[in-house]
């Protein structure tokens, strides 16, 4: 299940991409399949070990080309262990809502992105997230350890990116079918994954992800603008001019 649209990201073979807060690795794996050189960064040893196992399995199964590379790296989002202007592409998917100092984290991403490079930042969309917070205090911080600490509007996310020196461009919503699932989870208790209704809905989501039937794909596309669980904002880092100032590069991503 991908949140980022790789056509908009314009990832190319050989690009060096950072998946910051990679978690279980879904975007890192897709980037690896696309022939990129992938840095999968997370703070969790367990998540990184799982990613490393999958990278090896993908290589052994011949899913990736000889030039594709992938490396799990443990690191702190507020102090990225990379030099300035390192990455061609960056993905930060469902990370910022967990960080108290999100401004520092986005500034770090801007620092390590190459001038002219593209970044995709995804966070839970305002309406679905607001419903979750209203239904259950256990869904978010402080009752949920490591849980969500804020609710973003798209405008607020764009402001954070601009403040870090990035140029926000196109955006879209994703995963509308997942919003009711999380509302249901919050209604019965976020930790109650064995509730019959939760289990039944989860089976539908798994079926949709595996089979991708037309009816659910079409329905989700229609619902995404309103109920999409995640909002994705793409942006670029301005390129320096010969005069030493900067100029914005219009992002080559669809609006």
Regions found by a protein language model. Give the residues of each.
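Conserved S-adenosyl-L-methionine
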Residues: 166-176
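An amphipathic, basic-hydrophobic alpha-helix
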Residues: 3-8, 157, 211-220
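Short, solvent-exposed turn/loop segments enriched in Gly/Ser/Thr/Pro and often Arg
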Residues: 124-127, 174-179
């Amino acid at each position: 299940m991908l949140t980022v649209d790789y056509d908009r990201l314009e990832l190319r073979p050989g690009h060096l991409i950072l998946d910051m807060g990679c978690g279980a690795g879904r975007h890192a794996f897709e980037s690896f399949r696309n022939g990129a050189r992938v840095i999968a960064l997370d703070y969790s040893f367990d998540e990184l070990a799982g990613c490393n196992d999958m990278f090896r399995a993908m290589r052994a199964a011949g899913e990736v080309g000889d030039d594709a590379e992938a490396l799990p790296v443990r690191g702190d989002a507020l102090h990225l262990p990379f030099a300035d202007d390192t990455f061609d592409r960056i993905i930060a998917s469902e990370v910022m809502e967990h960080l108290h100092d999100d401004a520092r984290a986005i500034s770090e991403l801007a620092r390590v992105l190459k001038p002219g490079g593209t970044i995709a930042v995804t966070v839970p969309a305002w309406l679905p997230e607001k419903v979750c917070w209203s239904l259950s205090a256990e869904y978010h911080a402080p009752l949920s350890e490591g849980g969500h600490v804020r609710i973003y509007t798209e405008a607020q996310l764009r402001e954070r990116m601009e403040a870090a020196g990035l140029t926000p461009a196109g955006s879209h919503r994703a995963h509308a079918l997942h919003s009711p699932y999380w509302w249901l989870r919050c209604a019965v208790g976020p930790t109650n994954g064995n509730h019959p209704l939760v289990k039944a809905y989860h089976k539908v989501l798994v079926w949709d992800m595996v089979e991708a039937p037309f009816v659910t794909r079409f329905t989700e596309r229609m619902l995404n603008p309103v109920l999409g669980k995640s909002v994705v904002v793409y942006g670029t880092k301005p390129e320096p001019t010969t005069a030493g100032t900067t100029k914005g590069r219009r992002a080559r991503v669809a609006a």
